[in-house]
Curated annotation (Swiss-Prot):
Main location: cytoplasm
Role summary: Catalyzes the decarboxylation of carboxynorspermidine and carboxyspermidine. Essential for biofilm formation.
Name of the protein described by the UniProt record: Carboxynorspermidine/carboxyspermidine decarboxylase
Record bears the keyword Chaperone: no
Subcellular location: Cytoplasm
Positions of substrate binding: E248, D284
Catalytic activity: carboxynorspermidine + H(+) = norspermidine + CO2; carboxyspermidine + H(+) = spermidine + CO2
The EC number(s) this enzyme carries: 4.1.1.96
Gene Ontology molecular function: carboxy-lyase activity; diaminopimelate decarboxylase activity; protein homodimerization activity; pyridoxal phosphate binding
Cofactor: pyridoxal 5'-phosphate
InterPro entries registered for this protein in UniProt: Ala_racemase/Decarboxylase_C, Nsp_de-COase, PLP-binding_barrel
Cellular compartments per GO CC: cytoplasm
Top EC class, one word: lyase
């Protein structure tokens, strides 16, 4: 396996063709140091949520700080096992028997989403991996209903009033994934207390509890000490090993999507068209209607533009931003905080060029992680032609 030391060394930023993602090693390590401290004061273990960030080319930076990976599908399980190591947790909203057989020999924990799946496949897991079940506690913290695991008619986890209490005698652990971008430590502690009160007598029978992801402990001003104390108290109260499954918390504010202005048009408002698209390269901007932020923008700027994509989707735009000076064709812009749920969702809509991926090392060296070309685009559409 190639490493960062083997490929793409000694590159200069000015030579890089847009669009591309630039991962900043120093910023990544700053987040990881916070994670390390939280682990030390709380005793919690952390597994990286690959659904959020799977760019394995930088896993050598992350591995010394975390305990392994957690996955939402069989290919993520394999990727975590092969490229990260440590503990490999396997979870899926819906397993097939083939899926279970495919990963059971390489995972340490297998977590089922329902009691029916647990009953159907537990015989394949017992003796090979620690057995877990996802519980939906009916409480959550999420800014948008689309990402709320406790939303009405949720399919995520076993509803509290549907649990067969005997199940806790034959599993090793449970997962409660109930947060999305939770920056409020008191709100999280409130969720912890609710879980302890409602499920405590069951948790006392278990070996481990995963509290999922979505806890934004690296957000500026977050009270990590308070979080650590609450996690430690919970683990001691129920005599369990606690896990967190951070994704965004690890890679937030580490990565820019760098684009170039290719045209400027006007239809009631100026639009700077860039060589990228939210539909293809930053999908959550479109899905959640959360405008991106641009490094070069200024709140007090006098020149306002829509930062529009080059896709054919009429509403595909990154944001509206103000600038101190008029934008120029050929100018580069940095779309900030573009690591989480971006590279894992890249697609070939419109046949647009896929962004390359680079890492800026602590010493300033630029190293290539990935690049894509026409053959990659063609291969995703067909490998064979009908006869």
């Amino acid at each position: 396996m190639e490493t960062l030391q083997d490929i793409g060394t000694n590159m200069l930023k000015d030579e890089l063709r847009t669009p591309y993602f630039m991962i900043d090693e120093a910023k990544l390590i700053a987040n990881l140091e916070i994670a390390k401290h939280l682990k030390e004061i709380s005793g919690v273990k952390m597994v990286l949520a690959l659904k959020c960030f799977s760019t394995w080319g930088v896993f050598d930076i992350i591995k010394p700080y975390l305990d392994g990976t957690t996955s939402s599908g069989p290919f993520e399980v394999k990727l975590g096992y092969e490229t990260f190591g440590g503990e490999t947790h396997a979870y899926s909203v819906g397993y097939s028997e083939e899926d279970v057989k495919e990963v059971i020999d390489i995972c340490d924990k297998m977590i089922f989403n329902s009691q029916s799946q647990l009953a159907a496949y537990r015989h394949l897991v017992e003796g090979k991996a620690s057995l877990g079940l996802r519980i939906n506690p009916g409480v959550s913290y999420a800014g948008q209903d689309l990402a709320n695991p406790a939303r009405q008619f949720s399919r995520l986890g076993v509803q509290a009033d549907h649990i067969d209490e005997s199940v806790f005698d034959s599993i090793n652990g449970v997962m409660f994934h109930m947060n999305c971008e939770n920056k409020d430590v008191d709100a999280f502690i409130g969720l912890l207390d609710a879980i302890s009160e409602r499920f405590g007598r069951y948790l006392d029978k278990l070996d481990w509890v995963s509290l999922g992801g979505g806890v934004f402990f690296t957000w500026p001003g977050y009270d990590v000490e308070k979080l650590g104390a609450a996690l430690k108290a919970f683990a001691e109260r129920h005599a369990v090993q606690l896990y967190l499954e951070p994704g965004e918390a690890i890679i937030t504010k580490t990565t820019d999507l760098v684009v170039t202005v290719v045209d400027i048009v006007e239809n009631g408002m100026k639009t700077a068209i860039v060589d990228s698209a939210t539909e293809a390269h930053r999908l959550d901007t479109l899905i959640y209607k959360e405008p991106a932020s641009v490094l070069e923008a200024s709140d007090k700027g006098q020149h306002e533009y829509v930062i529009g994509s080059c896709s054919c989707l009429a509403g595909d735009q990154f944001c509206v931003a103000k600038f101190d000076e008029p934008l120029q064709v050929g100018q580069k812009l940095h779309i900030l905080d573009s690591a989480g749920y971006t590279m894992v969702k890249l697609n070939w809509f419109n046949g647009l060029k896929m962004p390359s991926v680079y890492c800026e090392r602590k010493n300033g060296q630029i190293q290539k992680i990935n690049q894509f070309g026409y053959e990659d685009f063609k291969r995703t559409l067909s490998l064979w032609s009908i006869e």
